[in-house]
Structures are given as C-alpha cells and as structure tokens.
C-alpha cells in the first residue's frame, strides 16, 4: 500500500502540489502521471527545495523532504523545519575592473557595485548608503541629519529621506537607528519597509569578520558624488584607493590649513572624526579621491581566496575632492556586533 501520493510540478519558479489517492484513475490531468511501480521495490514520494538566482538555502539538511506514514513532510536532518532562502552577498555579476579608467581618475561602474544606494535629503542633498542585507543599509549618522536642526531625532529624519537602490528603484524607509555613540562613531542603520528582491543590480555587500583595513590594501569606493570640477555626476562611478597610514593621516589633518579656513586646522576647514574606530584611505599627493556626496558608501575589498566582496569601512568624511587627500572611514569590524544586534532586535 503506497498510501497518499503528492504529485509535484515545478512551473516557472513556483512549486505546485496535487493530492491524489492510490488509484491512478483518480488523476484527471495526465501531466501528473502516477509513478510506475517496480518489482521488489517501492516508490518514495519526496520533493526538494531549490533557491532562486542570487539566493542560497540556509539549512542543516539537504533540502529534500519525504512523506512519512503520518503524512508529514520530513527531512532526515532537520525534521519538519523548513529551510530559509537568504540573499547572496558580495558576488557582483560584473566585478570592478581596475584597468578601465575614465576622465577624472574615476571609473565607470556598470553593475559592479550593486550594494550602492543613493539617498537624497529633503533639501536635495545627495549622499550614499550601503545595502548589507535585503532590508537594511548602513550610512553615516551625519547623512541622516542633513538639513535638520541639532534637536532632531531619528524619527524626525526618516520621513524626510528618499532612497534609491539599483537603477533608480525607489524604496520606502521604515526607520533609522543611530549608533549609540554616533558623535564618535559616525554610523546609522536604515531599515526598509519591505525586503528588496536581490538580483544582478541590487545585492548586499558582505560584512567582514576580520579586519581588511590594512595599510596598503586597495579598496574600491563608489558613489554619485562630485567630480573634481565640483559637479554632481549623473552616473555611478568608483575609484581605487589604498588604506593609508593612520598616523600620517592624523598629522595631515592636524597640520594642514587653507587660507580662508584656518580654524580648526584642516585642509577643508572642519575636523574629521579620527579614532580607533576609523581608518584613512588615499595618498598624500593623489588627486583621485572620492568627493562630497559619497559619504555612506562602502570601502569595498575583494577577498580573492573567497571571491567575495566585503565592506571594510563606510566613508564618513571627504568633502573636498582635490584638497583633502585622505578620506576617513568607519571600520565595519568596530560596528559589526552593534549592527547584528540592532537588526536582530528590530
């Protein structure tokens, strides 16, 4: 006695099931024939969960479920617990090419940075944000308070921001969460109202479990910031930059001035946040840095062994294009625990 039979059809990307009894005459649709029996054997009814492109199955089992005598679908390893599909991170279809340079030292990003988001304030100021999973993005705390008073709260900020992912795909913001020490750690999180569909144009970047911000390591920073003629760019671009020596970066900002802005001492008239939670990238005589509008973008590092892209940092400070040679980034390893905790609690 074979018991009840579940006939399955994978139609497009949806899984459909038809229920029937043992009697093959009960099957009215010949697209679902009853499996033929064999001598000295039996038919085992099972199905397998598959993942869509740009997702992976998260399960301790193999995704295969069989029908037991209690008419329950059971996996040998996890029982009736179902697998989950989670988005792939850090696997762009068209990774950055370090050879194809364009005017101004920046590079044209053709789907190379699918984690890059564009955020626009209520006064039309453009900044960056970085997708880290299907529903959350990292950006700077300063970005979240653009055009707001000192007394503004995170709740005040969220409704005034417009956010785009991929190619101008508008997404709605549910809430923003500031780092508890955002005056020293210039970071905030954005939660979307709905999860985004991950594809070749929209994909999160991975968060690292180790420090990739080693002096001399080259990373890639993308954004819609100003070019070196101080015009906002229409297309996403990127630049390659090495991690700089922190002490040299600190001396640069402490000892440099411009004639019209001598206080505080800094090449751009304001002092960046430099502490154990930050690192610098760029070179002292290099004119191909990121520019105003890129804050919130990731310092993306390619791990060649894993063939995976990680966010080593989030750009916090770089407002001058050709004046300040170093950009300042918040280390993602410094905020990783807070990020995971905040996402879990929200």
Swiss-Prot record:
Gene3D superfamilies, sorted: Complement Module, domain 1, Trypsin-like serine proteases
Keyword Signal: yes
Signal peptide: 1-16
Keywords: Disulfide bond, Hemoglobin-binding, Secreted, Serine protease homolog, Signal, Sushi
Keyword Signal: yes
Disulfide bonds: 249-280, 291-321
GO terms of molecular function: hemoglobin binding; serine-type endopeptidase activity
Pfam families: Trypsin (PF00089)
UniProt xrefs under SUPFAM superfamilies: Trypsin-like serine proteases
GO terms for cellular component: blood microparticle; extracellular space
One GO BP: zymogen activation
Compartments (UniProt record): Secreted
Xref: InterPro entries: Haptoglobin, Peptidase_S1_PA, Peptidase_S1_PA_chymotrypsin, Peptidase_S1A, Trypsin_dom
Residues covered by the Sushi domain: 32-85
Described function: Primate-specific plasma protein associated with apolipoprotein L-I (apoL-I)-containing high-density lipoprotein (HDL). Binds hemoglobin with high affinity and may contribute to the clearance of cell-free hemoglobin to allow hepatic recycling of heme iron.
Domain characteristics, as noted in the entry: The uncleaved signal sequence interacts with HDL fluid lipids and mediates incorporation into the HDL particle.
Family: Belongs to the peptidase S1 family.
Name of the protein described by the UniProt record: Haptoglobin-related protein
Protein's organism: Pan troglodytes
Gene: HPR
């Amino acid at each position: 006695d074979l018991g009840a039979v579940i006939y399955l059809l994978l139609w497009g990307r949806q899984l459909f099931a038809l229920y029937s009894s043992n009697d093959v005459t009960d099957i009215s649709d010949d697209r679902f024939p009853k499996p033929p029996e064999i001598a000295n054997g039996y038919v085992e009814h099972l199905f397998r969960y598959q993942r869509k492109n740009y997702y992976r199955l998260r399960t301790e089992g193999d995704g295969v479920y069989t029908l037991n005598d209690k008419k329950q679908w059971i996996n040998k390893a996890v029982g009736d617990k179902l697998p989950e599909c989670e988005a792939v991170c850090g696997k762009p279809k068209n990774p950055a090419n370090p050879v194809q340079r364009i005017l101004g030292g920046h590079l044209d990003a053709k789907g190379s940075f699918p984690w890059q988001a564009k955020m626009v304030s209520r006064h039309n100021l453009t900044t960056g944000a970085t997708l880290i999973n299907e529903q959350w993005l990292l950006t700077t705390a300063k970005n979240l308070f653009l055009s707001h008073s000192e007394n503004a709260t995170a709740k005040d900020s969220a409704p005034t921001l417009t956010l785009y992912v991929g190619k101008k795909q508008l997404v709605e913001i549910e809430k923003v969460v500031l780092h508890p020490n955002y005056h020293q750690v210039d970071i905030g999180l954005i939660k979307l109202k709905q999860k985004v569909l991950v594809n070749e144009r929209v994909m999160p970047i991975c968060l690292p479990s180790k420090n990739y911000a080693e002096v001399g390591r080259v990373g890639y920073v993308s954004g819609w910031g100003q070019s070196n003629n101080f015009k906002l760019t229409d297309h996403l671009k990127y630049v390659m930059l090495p991690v700089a020596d922190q002490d040299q970066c600190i001396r640069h900002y402490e000892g440099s001035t411009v004639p019209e802005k001598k206080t505080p001492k800094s090449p751009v008239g304001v002092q960046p946040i430099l502490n154990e939670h930050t690192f610098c990238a760029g070179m002292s005589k290099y004119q191909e840095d990121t520019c105003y509008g890129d804050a919130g973008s990731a310092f993306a590092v390619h791990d060649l062994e894993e063939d995976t892209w990680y966010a080593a940092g989030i750009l916090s400070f770089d407002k001058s294009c050709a004046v300040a040679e170093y950009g300042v980034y918040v280390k993602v390893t410094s905020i990783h625990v807070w990020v995971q905790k905040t996402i879990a609690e929200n």
